[in-house]
Structure formats: structure tokens, C-alpha cells
């Protein structure tokens, strides 16, 4: 356990249950204990923890809304702050680097937008920006400078590029508006290298991860390296990639395979950012989402069709994953999220 954290909570979006399942992870064994179940007015999806670690945002997809929660570090629970109608079914939600603006991307609507976040952490109704792109907008994240935002789209096989104004919370189109990888890859989710000017996207139909160079001056992306997530003898027509994560030290990347039902691992070259396959680790049926813990010791993958969680301990030296636990969960888990609980300062005795 990281010295800063008193506990690790894990939240699971169970779409079929229309509920958020809350667990606590044992930092030594990796075992999960369920703490609560939060019912929602629609199917939950994407989740995001604010930069200060005090808020959790959850897309309530079928209600076209976003739910906000205060993370109560003393009681190790979530306190509801409200559910805000954003007028779109958000496949992905995130905040900017300051935590003052909520960003979202709608797969079915082909639109992205931003909303202000109030001082209490709730999302304020009435958007700051709303920009049409194309169908199949899968994710949205801002870069480390909080200046550029990227939205991978599978159907048009493109990454849509935006400028972000942290003062106003508004998105605007960058020029050129799109960056295209090789034909048929279909970028889905993304992860920024913590040191190098590189962004990695997992490719839904390409069964691969593609690295893009990031021009820190104009925000433009350019694909330069692609590596498969599958073993050579597996039929790629029976697979699609879903999620991607990079370790905090930038040394390893993981991507999930739906069909092959595995987590693919890669070593990252410290100078070039190019990837070397480390193989695949079996996991649950249709791993739509997985997440690395804050110290990168634990990785949890959610099997959307097996309705379960698979908990792995990660070797920090070689990136290998060792399965420690299997946990049944709610029906149709589409997202799993670590929620760190901080240690509270002891009150001085008077």
C-alpha cells in the first residue's frame, strides 16, 4: 500500500443492474470485500477520479447524465453530490487537469462537450461547449499541459484533435481537426506517456496499440508505430481491443482483448517509446475495462459477459501479471475504477 493511502476502494459500473458496486481491496492479498451498492436511474459506464482525489464522476449512459460523488476518506464511502443531465449518452467522462471542467464524449451522438464543475464538486447544468464530430466517439482526455484534448473515433478511423482553454472550460477544433492511423485500425481509448511526447491508442479492429508523436507546440498527433495485442496464431476477426493503461513510470503498457479474452502487456523503450510485446494474460469473458491501482501493484479486469472481476498482482520489474483472486460482481460490468482513500492527519491531542 502506498504510504499516502489508508485504503483502496474499487467501483464497478454494472450496466445491467443500473448500479455502482463499491468494494474495498485488501492491500496485501488483493481480495475484495463488497461495501455497498448504489442504485442509479440508468446504466452506468465510464468513471473518473478528480485530480485532487476527492470526487468521482460516473456517466449514467441511458439517462444522458453524469453522477458526481464526494469521496469520504474518513468513512471510506461515496457521498452523492447530484446527477446532472448533459443531454448526451456519454461513453467517456473525464476532468481537465485542474478538476474544474468535466469533459465528455458521446459514441451514439457523435458529439463532445464540456461542463463546469461547481465548488462542491457537482457538475453544473448547461454546457460550456458542445461540438459535433462523428459517430463512435469513444474517449476524451487532455494532455499534461491542459491545452490539447484528443477524442479517438472507431468508425471514421480517426483521432479528433481539440484545443482546450482551461480558463473558460471550452473546447475548440484544432487545425487540422483529425489525425488518421493506418486503414482499419479504429482507435478506441488512449494513454499519455508520463515523460515522452507520445500518446498510445488501442485499436479496436486493428487488434493493436499504436503510438503517436505529440507536437507539444501545436498539439498535432502523428502515428509512427503499431504492434499487435494478439498471439500470431489467433484469428483477429474474433477479437476487438477495448481498454489501455500505462504505468506511472512509463515502462509498461497494457491493453485488453475482447474475444481472445486477455490482457496484453508491452515493454516501453525509454528513448523511442516503441513497444515490445510481453505476451498475453488470460482474463474474464469480454474484458471491456480494466484499471491499474495508484501504486501500480494491482490490476483489476472486468469480464462484461462473465460478470466478474479478475485481480492480478503486477511485477514492477518485468511487467508480468499474476492472478490472485476472482470475484463475481454485478451484471454486465463495463467499467472498473480504483478509488484511493487517503490517510487523515491525526488530530493533535490537547
What residue ranges belong to the model's regions?
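Hydrophobic beta-strand positions that form the internal "hydrophobic ladder"
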Residues: 8-10, 56, 102, 149, ...
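A short beta-strand motif characteristic of beta-propeller blades
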Residues: 33-39, 79-84, 125-131, 174-180, ...
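Beta-rich, blade/repeat-based domains predominating
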Residues: 41-52, 86-100, 130-148, 180-197, ...
Amino acid at each position: 500500500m502506498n504510504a499516502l493511502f489508508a485504503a483502496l476502494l474499487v467501483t464497478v459500473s454494472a450496466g445491467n443492474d443500473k448500479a455502482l458496486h463499491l468494494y474495498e481491496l485488501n492491500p496485501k492479498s488483493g481480495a475484495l470485500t463488497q461495501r455497498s451498492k448504489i442504485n442509479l436511474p440508468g446504466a452506468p459506464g465510464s468513471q473518473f477520479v478528480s485530480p485532487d482525489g476527492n470526487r468521482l464522476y460516473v456517466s449514467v449512459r441511458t439517462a444522458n447524465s453524469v453522477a458526481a460523488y464526494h469521496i469520504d476518506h474518513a468513512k471510506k464511502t461515496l457521498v452523492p453530490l447530484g446527477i446532472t443531465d448533459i443531454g448526451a449518452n456519454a461513453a467517456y467522462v473525464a476532468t481537465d487537469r485542474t478538476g474544474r471542467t468535466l469533459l465528455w464524449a458521446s459514441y451514439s451522438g457523435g458529439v463532445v462537450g464540456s461542463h463546469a464543475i461547481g465548488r462542491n464538486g457537482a457538475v453544473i447544468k448547461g454546457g460550456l461547449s458542445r461540438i459535433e464530430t462523428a459517430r463512435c466517439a469513444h474517449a476524451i482526455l487532455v494532455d499534461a499541459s491542459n491545452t490539447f484534448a484528443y477524442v479517438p473515433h472507431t468508425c471514421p478511423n480517426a483521432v479528433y484533435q481539440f484545443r482546450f482553454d482551461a480558463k473558460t472550460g471550452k473546447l475548440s477544433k484544432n487545425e487540422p481537426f483529425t489525425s488518421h492511423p493506418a486503414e482499419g485500425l479504429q482507435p478506441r481509448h488512449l494513454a499519455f506517456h508520463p515523460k515522452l511526447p507520445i500518446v498510445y491508442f488501442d485499436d479496436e479492429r486493428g487488434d493493436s496499440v499504436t503510438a503517436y508523436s505529440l507536437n507539444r507546440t501545436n498539439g498535432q498527433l502523428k502515428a509512427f508505430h503499431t504492434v499487435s495485442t494478439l498471439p500470431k496464431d489467433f484469428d483477429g476477426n474474433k477479437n476487438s481491443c477495448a481498454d489501455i493503461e500505462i504505468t506511472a513510470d512509463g515502462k509498461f503498457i497494457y491493453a485488453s482483448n475482447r474475444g481472445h479474452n486477455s490482457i496484453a502487456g508491452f515493454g516501453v523503450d525509454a528513448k523511442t517509446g516503441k513497444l515490445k510485446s510481453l505476451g498475453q494474460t488470460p482474463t474474464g469473458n469480454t474484458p471491456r475495462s480494466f484499471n491499474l491501482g495508484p501504486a501500480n501493484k494491482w490490476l483489476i479486469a472486468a469480464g462484461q459477459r462473465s460478470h466478474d472481476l479478475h485481480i492480478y498482482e503486477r511485477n514492477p520489474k518485468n511487467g508480468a501479471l499474476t492472478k490472485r483472486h476472482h470475484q463475481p460482481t454485478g451484471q454486465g460490468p463495463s467499467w472498473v475504477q480504483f478509488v484511493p482513500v487517503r490517510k487523515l492527519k491525526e488530530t493533535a491531542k490537547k
